[in-house]
Amino acid sequence: THSHSDHIGGVECLALMNRYVGIKFLDKPKLTMLINEPYEKVLWEMSLRGGMEWNEVNGEGKRLGFSDFFDVVRPTLKTSVPREIWEVNYGDIHIELFLTNHIPEQAPSSEEAFITYGLFVDNRIFISGDTKFDRELIDMYASRSEWMFHDSQINPNPVHACLPELKTLPKEITEKMFLMHYPDNAQANAIDEFAGWAQQGMRYIFD
């Protein structure tokens, strides 16, 4: 969804291990990456390139690039209004990727923020990704969502939604909203109006 290390910190290691162990010795394919062209450039140039480009030259005698590690699946631009939304079908899964307003603190809207995305899966499940409290975004997807997973800090935060802000939402939204990306001590707080805290390591299956 975006380039902070708590979201991409393992990508370099995963890609290198796959190239030099998985592909070389275990007959594994390249990793599949669902990513649009604007974010691929950001991810490679600003985060991954320094640790991945110089490990060898490829079959064409060039230093390694993004496509040497990943089979890329491109979303298509669905709309730019009221915010940028991309979509892609991967197997039986349909995914929308929508811009969020996460960073910098001073960005007044998703259009003026650095590239960060949230997900809407199979026209059913909303995953906010990292975002400030953005009522416009929530209202765009709330009526279409069976369940919602939303970024939540406990105290006011300049780049994340916080619990007091999310508690201003109507019951028909909060009762289907799980809170995620919360600090370790968050569960000491009462959230009876919400669906619950999203649990680390838990697989959620929606029939």
Predicted ranges, named:
Residues 114, 131-207:
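Cap/insert and terminal regions of metallo-dependent hydrolase folds
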